[in-house]
Design a protein with these regions (language model features):
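Peripheral terminal and linker regions in Fe-S/redox and tRNA-modifying enzymes
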Residues: 1-309
């Protein structure tokens, strides 16, 4: 008789000492909170590129700063753009920053953000300040954080959209970005929010997708969880709920807390994404845990596409 292997949900939740023993990035985060590295940036610059410990280079990821590849002593700076929407003034500002600090070159990313390259280390404070002056941020553009929030590129102007989600995206970005309670996640965490009936933002491949829908005349969202690509691709699963527009932050917090508070997803970086939580518990189990986290039941709903107007 062959013994059945227990599912992830049946295994004992590992203690923190085991997490720290097996996962060097979790140790690094415990030793020094990554967002705090910004206060040490002048000291790191004074020490020089070659003298910076690799652990501090990793912590700089939390500020959207990473080695250029190959490692040539300059840095890539990633900028968050909520929903991929830039004003003309912001675009001109980024162009000026690129001209002055990044060899007049910039990249548009697949997650609707921006990247600069070849930024010299001693110029990083000036670049970060210029980005902030443009009303943008690099905080959490990399690292174990909520990354840039993607959406339909024609939010607010498409005649087919069910409703304008730009205010929701701005609210979610304000809550999560730079929030210390959500800057020590098991792994990177990707949201997409849209009310595009064509789902051009690919909700199937995101960690959490808020999919615009209308129920009984009320605008809101269906919720999909656990999508992702890489070496272990998954299509996100529909939780079978309807969330009113004004509860968007609440549902995103609750789902994220269920995941980040379970040490099972901190032992191995390769098994840390929220898709493995969905593998272990299924969408019904995830919904139950989210309802427990919220302290209330969620309204039934569906992620079925609603035809455009």
């Amino acid at each position: 008789m062959t013994a059945t292997q227990p599912t992830g949900a049946q295994l004992e939740v590992p203690p923190w000492d085991l997490v720290l023993k097996r996962n060097s990035i979790e140790r690094l985060k415990q030793e020094k909170f990554p967002l705090d590295i910004i206060h040490e940036l002048p000291e790191l610059i004074a020490r020089g590129y070659e003298a910076i410990p690799e652990e501090d280079i990793v912590r700089l990821y939390w500020w959207g700063i990473a080695h250029d590849k190959p490692k040539i002593g300059t840095f890539m700076v990633r900028i968050k753009v909520p929903g991929g929407l830039l004003s003309p003034a912001q675009l001109r500002a980024i162009g000026a920053i690129s001209l002055r600090y990044g060899r007049n070159y910039g990249e548009l990313t697949t997650r609707q953000g921006l990247q600069l390259h070849w930024v010299r280390m001693e110029k990083l404070p000036e670049v970060l300040e210029a980005i902030a002056q443009a009303g943008l941020t690099t905080v959490g553009a990399e690292g174990d954080t909520v990354r840039n929030i993607t959406s339909c590129p024609v939010n607010g102007i498409s005649r087919d959209e069910l409703f304008d989600v730009r205010p929701v995206i701005e609210q979610v970005a304000r809550f999560f970005w730079g929030n210390r309670d959500y800057s020590n996640l098991p792994r990177k965490h990707k949201f997409t929010i849209a009310a595009c009936p064509y789902q051009c933002n690919a909700p199937e491949i995101h960690d959490i997708a808020l999919v615009g829908t209308v129920k009984d005349g009320r605008p809101g969202f269906a919720v999909r969880v656990g999508g992702g690509l890489s070496a272990t691709p998954r299509l996100s699963r529909d939780l079978g709920v309807f969330v009113p527009v004004d509860e968007a932050v609440d549902i995103l917090r609750a789902i994220t807390d269920v995941w980040q508070n379970n040490n099972r997803y901190r032992v191995s970086r390769a098994k840390a994404r929220i898709k493995f939580l969905v593998d272990d518990y299924g969408p019904e189990g995830v919904r139950r845990m989210v309802e427990e986290q919220l302290g209330r039941s969620l309204e039934d709903g569906s992620g079925e596409v609603v035809p455009g107007k």
